[in-house]
Amino acid sequence: MPMTGFYETISPRDQQRPPIWFLRQVGRYIPQYQELKRNRSLKDFFLDTESIVEATLLGPSLLGVDAAIVFADILSILEGFSVDYRFAPGPEVSYSPHEPLIFTKDPQETFSFLLEAIQQLTKRLTVPLIAFAASPFTLASYLIEGGASRDYPKTIAFLYQYPDRFKALLDEITLGTATYLQMQVQAGAAAIQLFESSSLRLPPHLFAKYVVAPNTKLIRQIKQTGNPPISLFCRCFYQEFLSLYAIGADTLHPDYHVELPEVYRQIHSPGSIQGNFDPALLLLPQDALIAHLEAYLAPLKQQSHYIFNLGHGILPQTPIENVQAVVSCLTSISTS
């Protein structure tokens, strides 16, 4: 059963409303972000301390959210694995999955740009800072596919043809990811968000093997150092979501395929849940958006340890005014 540490870490004090933050809350939809990035390459931007700091600060300053999330990419960890990658503009990865994936022996040096950014952010922020990384299956899918994919054909074929090597790859990713996140917490991050965004492709009989088991192992390893609160975002359907209750996360964050009212009806003590408003609704005219938001929130108002977020990241074409309107609406709605 999920605990409540993540909720308590980011919950606004003395306010009877759910905590608020967004997946991909800083990105191309924000004009100030576009100005920060200008003509620089995305990879250079992700590897620059000052850029990470200034971009991360945009979330709380422009949106009024209750948490900041480190501005990085799920491929940033590949710096520690010495795997070549770039954005052209989408992610492209050069790696053979038959090769052992070995994490750097000096992660403090390899990720000094990131750790310095976190240290600076903790001094400047008035809200908690969240570190994040891809979960093992999702990062493995990027490595095998050579980038983003819709149907993950290479990944599915590889795990069937080379099951032992695929399991070893997940173990290698788990080991490096645990170190990557532990040192961010040691640098000052208050909580961790894991992203299992490729998991919707897996049929049920593979979900337990390649999502539940690796995430359980990863969370256990992370919590050996400092026991930081952890939330897991996972793209899945209802039955697969229920199986995530065994992994040891503090908060579970389903995508928009899971109906939260159904979760609360079926599970007596569901713990802390985060999500899962459809980001496509942020494209609607504001009056329609707010109507959908209020309908979405109505069955959740009496639920404890609920965190408002999206069922996926904010879309690039989203008007920033709509995101701000959502925050304004939420801060005015009592959950008492």
Swiss-Prot record:
- Residues bound to substrate are R24, Q25, V26, G27, R28, D73, Y142, S197, H312
Root EC class: lyase
The species this protein belongs to is Chlamydia trachomatis serovar D (strain ATCC VR-885 / DSM 19411 / UW-3/Cx)
Keyword NADP among record annotations: no
GO BP: heme biosynthetic process; protoporphyrinogen IX biosynthetic process
Q: Name one GO cellular component term.
A: cytosol
Q: Which domain of life is it from?
A: Bacteria
Keyword list, A-Z: Cytoplasm, Decarboxylase, Lyase, Porphyrin biosynthesis
Q: Which reaction does it catalyse?
A: uroporphyrinogen III + 4 H(+) = coproporphyrinogen III + 4 CO2
- Supply the InterPro entries for this chain: UROD/MetE-like_sf, Uroporphyrinogen_deCO2ase_HemE, Uroporphyrinogen_deCOase
Q: Give the NCBIfam families listed for this entry.
A: hemE (TIGR01464)
**Could you tell me which cysteines form disulfide bridges?**
none
Task: Please provide, alphabetically and separated by semicolons, the GO molecular function terms listed in this UniProt record.
Answer: uroporphyrinogen decarboxylase activity
Official protein name in the record? Uroporphyrinogen decarboxylase
Originating gene: hemE
Location relative to the cell:
Cytoplasm
